[in-house]
Swiss-Prot record:
Organism taxonomic ancestry: Eukaryota, Metazoa, Chordata, Craniata, Vertebrata
Cysteine disulfide partners in this protein: 46-112
Signal peptide span: 1-23
Region (Complementarity-determining-1): 47-58
UniProt entry tagged with the keyword Transmembrane: no
Localisation per UniProt entry: Secreted; Cell membrane
GO cellular component assignments: extracellular region; immunoglobulin complex; plasma membrane
UniProt subunit comment: Immunoglobulins are composed of two identical heavy chains and two identical light chains; disulfide-linked.
The protein's name: Immunoglobulin kappa variable 3D-7
Amino acid sequence: MEPWKPQHSFFFLLLLWLPDTTGEIVMTQSPATLSLSPGERATLSCRASQSVSSSYLSWYQQKPGQAPRLLIYGASTRATGIPARFSGSGSGTDFTLTISSLQPEDFAVYYCQQDYNLP
C-alpha cells in the first residue's frame, strides 16, 4: 500500500471546497413532515446555505394533481387571495412560514424558494 502523503489530504479538501465556489444556494426545509389537526398552528422553517435577500424568498403550497400556488413573496407579503392565517417572516438565512389555525384545505405540501441566486 502506498504511504500516506500530505498532497492526498490537500486534494481531498480541495474536492470538498469546490462545490462552494459555484455560489449555489441550497435551501433546507424542516420539519420534513408535520402531524397536526385542524385549528392547530403550523410552523415551517426554511434555511439557506448562505444569506438570501428577503425580497427573493417565496413560499408555495402544492396539492396532489395541482400546480404550486404562491402563498408568500418577499419573505412576508401574502399573494393575492391568500388568507391572513398564512404569514411569513425571517431574513438572512432563516425564514418561517406560519399557518395560525389550520383549516382542512391547508393540508398540502409546502415549499420555500429563493430567486436571489439561481443555478
